[in-house]
């Protein structure tokens, strides 16, 4: 007791001040977009893009309420709810179609649809066939004979969103990580932009989408990743396994094999989808 009393007297005499530690808050539960929901790390600011660019589109895409669970296409709750920090508010359909590559195709398709850039909505299928939305809109439908695919005019012109969704579902059936690999090219980490992917083509393969990017005054960058997965499920923003409290991935810490919650990517998997 004497030693404790002396210690207390010493503290009072030195006027020792205790500072309250306030942790950095990464999640704003009231935010309904990436920009408003997930705060950048302390000392970092989001890199700004033109409002009509894809990075701004996905940064401001609606999210489901904070704390929402990831659901499968059949209405069942995904057993593992520990991998995500946010969920994009976009339907996944009622069939097991919108998986990993399909989710990225969906976001690019929705972006071009919102921009009314209909000529840019075109995706290669796994066999190399280019499936153009404008041909679908004009009434053409796929004629599949084994590995051979061609257009067959069987319907009327239809530019409705409902028809556009049917087009995307057909793309999901015949496209995947293998076709996405053929449309993409490797990039260096210092070139990273929202819309780039970590992609490993295969059966199965996997891909995740870079959905946001921030930078500090020293030029260090960090980014957010999102994914769909198998079976088809909500498109969700991933946690960082290295720090579950901080969803940002830091370029300075990135090494290969690159570990994400659902997949480990090899070197050379960082790619950009080239707009040909």
Predicted regions and their residues:
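Substrate-binding/catalytic groove segments of enzymes
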Residues: 113-116, 207, 216-220, 234-236
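Extracellular-facing segments of soluble proteins and assemblies that are Gly/Ser/Thr-biased and enriched
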Residues: 89-185
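N-terminal module-boundary/linker segments of secreted carbohydrate-active enzymes
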Residues: 3-80, 94-98
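Low-complexity, Gly/Ser/Thr/Pro-rich intrinsically disordered linker/tail segments
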Residues: 221-276
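Residue-level marker of positions within ordered structural domains that often coincide
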Residues: 109, 215, 230
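...with weaker cross-activation on analogous glycine-rich loops/strands in unrelated enzymes
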Residues: 161-219
């Amino acid at each position: 007791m004497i030693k404790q009393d002396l210690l207390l007297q010493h503290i009072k005499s030195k006027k020792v001040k205790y500072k309250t530690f306030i942790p950095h808050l990464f999640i704003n539960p009231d935010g309904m977009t990436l920009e408003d929901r997930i705060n950048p790390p302390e000392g970092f600011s989001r890199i700004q893009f033109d409002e009509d660019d894809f990075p701004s589109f996905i940064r401001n895409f609606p999210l489901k309420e904070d704390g929402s669970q990831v659901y499968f296409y059949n209405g069942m709750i995904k057993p593992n709810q520990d991998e995500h920090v946010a969920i994009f508010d976009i339907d996944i359909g009622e069939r097991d179609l919108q998986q990993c590559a399909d989710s990225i195709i969906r976001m690019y398709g929705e972006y071009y649809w919102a921009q009314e850039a209909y000529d840019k909505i075109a995706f290669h299928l796994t066999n190399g066939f280019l499936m153009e939305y404008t041909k679908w809109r004009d009434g053409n439908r796929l004629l599949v004979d084994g590995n051979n695919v061609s257009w067959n005019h069987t319907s009327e012109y239809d530019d409705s969103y409902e028809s556009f969704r049917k087009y995307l579902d057909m793309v999901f059936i015949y496209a995947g990580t293998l076709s996405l690999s053929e449309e993409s090219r490797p990039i260096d980490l210092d070139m990273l932009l929202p819309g780039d992917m970590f992609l490993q083509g295969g059966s199965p393969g996997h891909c995740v989408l870079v959905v946001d990017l921030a930078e500090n005054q020293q030029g260090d960058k960090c980014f957010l990743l999102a994914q769909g997965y198998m079976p088809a499920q909500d498109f969700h923003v991933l946690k960082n396994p290295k720090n579950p409290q901080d969803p940002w991935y830091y370029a300075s810490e990135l090494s290969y094999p690159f570990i994400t919650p659902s997949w480990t990517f090899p070197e050379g998997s960082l790619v950009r989808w080239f707009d040909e």
